[in-house]
Structure formats: C-alpha cells, structure tokens
C-alpha cells in the first residue's frame, strides 16, 4: 500500500515493498517516520511487485522508475477526482400531494414537478440536467422547488467509463484453415508456453484470437490483448465490443489520468469480486502489461514485430513483448504472438530454436489473393520526365482509374510535415533547431490557424516562423524533401475532386482524431488516405484497391542492422491494406533501387526468404539473436564533461569486456534538447551469463558517475535496443 514519507525537504509517495525484520546496527543510518498511510487496502498485487522487480533487474533501472511508469499518475500523486453528477430527489418526508399544494400558483414549477414525477427513478431520482432540459424550464424554477424543500440535490459519484448498450452478437465461425490453426495453437501450448502465429495479412488471425479469448473467459480467466499503436484500438474496439460487451476494457495513454485510475481500479476490483463480468478482456498498448491482473489465462501480442512495443525514451526501456512472455511464465498462462511479418528474433526462437511453437496461416481469408506488387523505377521516370512532383505518371494514371471505379487509395510516406528542411538557394544555409543538432522541418498545414509557415523540430518540439529570406545572405529558400503535407497538396492539384485525408501525428493529436479519420475512410467519406506508418498497422477497410509507397528507399537507407527487416515489415504490412475484400488488391512501390533484394522478397511475399538472408548476416556480424545488445547513452549539457565521462566509461568497459565493447559512437543527432549525446554498444554472446554482464556494466556506470569530473552525466543503459 502507499505511504507518504519524507525525502530530504520533500514529501513523496512510495509503496511498501518489504518489511525489514533484522535490526539496523549502522549508527550512520537515520530512520525517519512514515508520515501517513494512504490506503486501507493494497493498491498493487504481489504479481505486480514481482514483475516490477524483474523489469528493474532485466532493464537496469530502479523499482521506483518502474512504479512511475506502471501506475496512473492519479494514484501516485493521490490527486484522483471522482466524477460527480447531481441528481434531484424528494426532500425527506415530502409527498407528491404536499408538493402540489406548494406549487399551485406557479405553472412553471408545477410543470417541472410533473416532469420529475413522470421520470423519477426510485432510490435514484433524476439527473439535474435532464430535469431542466426535459421539462423545458429554467434552473431558477428548479431552485424554487429546492427552496420550498420539495426537492433536494444529491451528488453521486459516477464512472467515466461509458458502458456498452448495443446488441451482443456471436463470433463468426472459423473456416477450415482457421480451425486447423486454432487446433494447432492449442496443441502447441501443451509443449510451449509461447506460440508464434505467422499468418499473412487478412488471413483471419483476429477471428482466431476471438475464439481463444472466448475459451478463456468461459473459464473465468482474464485476457490481455496487446496492440502496438493506439490507432489500432479504434476499429478493434468496435469489433470486440459487439462480441464481449462490457467484459472489454480499453487502456492507453490517450485516456485522462482519472479515466486510467478508474480502469485500473475496475481490474483490481475484479480480483476481489471474481464473479463480476467486467474487466475480463483488456485491450491496450504496451503499458497495459502493468495492470493488476490476478487470473490471466492468455496474453495476445498482436503485430508482435512492431517496434512500438519498445519504450524508446525515459525509463524503464522495456519491451512489452518480452514482458508479456515473462508474465506468461509467472502467471502460468498462454502467450500468443501474432503477425504477418515476424521479428527475426521471434521467428528464430520458433523456427530454429523451437523455444516457441510455430503455427502458419499461408492464405488469405475467403481465398482472396495477396496483392500484386509492382515497382516503378524513379530513375527512369525522372530521366523520361514522366513525373509530376513526387508522383510518377504510371502511378497517377493508376490512381485515376481506381477512383473512377469508386474504389479507395492509401498512400504511404513515412515522414510528416511539408518538407524535410529548407535551404538557402544562394549560400546553402540550412535552418537548424536552437536546442538540437538537427534541421527544422517545414510545416504548412499543422499551424494553419497561425496563418504562417512554421519550422518545427521533431525532437524537442521547438517551433519558429519561417523567415521570408535567408538571414545570412538574403537569398531565397528552396524546399528539400517531402512529407505527408506536401503529398496532400499535390493530390489536390492532381485530383481536385478527390476527398483526401491525412493520418499522421499532427492530425491525430486529439483524443478522438484517430476514430474520426478511420470512420470517415471506412464510410467512404474520403477517397484517398495519406499517412505515415499509422496507415500500415492493422487497419481493415473493405474498399481499398490500391496502396502506393511514394519513396521506399528512405526505409532502407538508415544506419541500422534491422533496416532491411523493418523495411520489409512496413512495406508488407501497408501492402496488406489492399484488396482485403473481393478482388485482388494492387501495390505500387516507387524506388530508385528496383533491384534491391528486399523488393525481390516483397514482390513474392517471401518472408522466409528474407529471414534466411537476414539470419546469415546477423550471425556473421554478431547481432541478435546470436548476440545480446546493450546500448549505453551518455548525456550532459557540458560537452567536455560528456567527453570525459564517455572516455572513462569506454575504457573501463573495454577492460572488462574487450572487443565486445564498441568505441565511443557519435550519433547522427549529437545534441538533443541542449544535451550532448554519446553512445557505447555492448555485444554479449547469447550463451554468456547476461545477468553477470549487466552487473559488471552497472559497477562501471556507478564508478564513472562518482568521479568529480563526470558529475551530472546521465547514463542510460538500454537492454535489447530497437
């Protein structure tokens, strides 16, 4: 349970983890009293505390840092406020007959009283707002009834969680191939705690999930259904709600702190009241692994390959898939990893190491063919002058044909904004962020209410107005690179009658923005949807005939050993949005490298070919799954202090780990938010004692942080970086 304790001059909230039984003999240790016990019952379960401890050990952080990530802020800060609704009820002892005699001279008071009587609910009354709006009378009339002691106001706490009031429908029956996969999963669970379901896009994996969920709920178990992006919960929530009703709860960061507290408490209370039908199925993003489950029967990790499952900033830098697998062992529950494009590590564990079971769904539902994938050589198109801005002539013509057929189009560009940066056409100056060593991105539509073009840093959020001319030489600006905003403008020029929507971080900042865009496209209120990677993930639209990737090369040209894997996954996933119902879909990929091996695997939807290519490279160059990686980030606002700390740490680690320790790495963005950055990478053999390696690493980190010349250096180890 939570306690309030003094820490220096502050008061902080903590959770009692253990009782110390042995006496303290060290006189230098000062015992300070607990100021207050904040709870009468435990706020976390023993299962959660076990998980927090495992995460802190594995990801090299403190349990306090895990707690801060795990609990809604309203619980930690004790600032949760219940939502109250005012109801009107009879004043004690008042009867209808008595009330009539008190309002005979006022027709308005009598009218409101009549409405109250007609809509009165025993032991509850009627909501104040409903009484005013329903009767058509003013608040002053209601105040008169209160002043006459006819009615009284009763404030009642109500949930912010809106119950489902629609019709519950049965799940669809599985077809033969789905039924076979369902049975294979059940058999695999007899030997493996974790099973990988490798099913091509639109093969019906979600239907299999639903039947597995039903089986667990029938046994009184809880199910955690993880998705990598909040956007994915939108369509999926509607689908699951129609089957599971109020057993389904959704949990992610777009909810307010108070809403998250209420969901957390509902799940915790379902432990106390196991007969309740609420909070049995939890659909959520990665932070859902921290909820207070007690009787987990199944964890589903959908799109298990997605890097969004990894916490990239702050601490703990956990991976929800790894946490889910560990939870499966602790709770003795099944874990199902599902995807059309498995991570190399997961496929290796299933296909070669047999640590996981492996079940394959190789065909789409209802016999629909996988989309045909065509490449367009941009070098040839530019040479022939067959381009309109960033659209090749063949792509423009194909979009026109699809729109004329009444079908829809998805365009993918994994860069938001209008232009990547602006550059002086005379002196070559590029405007950079004042806080970071990175160029500013031009936005034209995000700040439309400002009426000016804006330059924004996508790292720290710094924004400034675009100057009319170069501040150095007065030259004109040229716009370099293109993002989703520019594509949107070009589409309006090419297809002035088309209804175009844009899905990126800028258009989906509001709580319901994802839902609104998805609904508009699903209801065919939009013809073309332009988007970043949000459009690649799990969305299911009936009428999409064509998907186009405007520049696939940017996915491949990154300094990341996973770049080919990630490019294949992203392109195969976005291709999977085409032709999900009825006729076969089509995918057009614009590239300057049409002969790249990734496009060869992609054109055949050959994941296994890509895997075999990648796994050989990984083994040769000492990367996962054969080696474990720990990326150490060092930060300091003083570059000299940072250099001293990074040099000392690298020397100590090299003494301990030898060539497993890299030289100091200067990142492409070497200063972020006014802090200078350096990296050191550790490669540890898969067969080595990784926990001992972590202990040696932390000893070196603590030593460096104790050196006077290195004080203030923030050192963050990232275990299994993405």
Question: What feature does the model see in each segment?
Answer:
Residues 1-339, 351-368, 656, 681, ...:
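Accessory, non-ATPase domains that flank or precede helicase/AAA+ motor cores in DNA-metabolism machines
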Residues 74-100, 379, 497-499, 510-529, ...:
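Accessory helical-bundle/CTD segments and flexible terminal tails appended to RecA-like ATPase motors
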Residues 224, 244-255, 434-437, 441-443, ...:
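Conserved RecA-like helicase motor-core motifs
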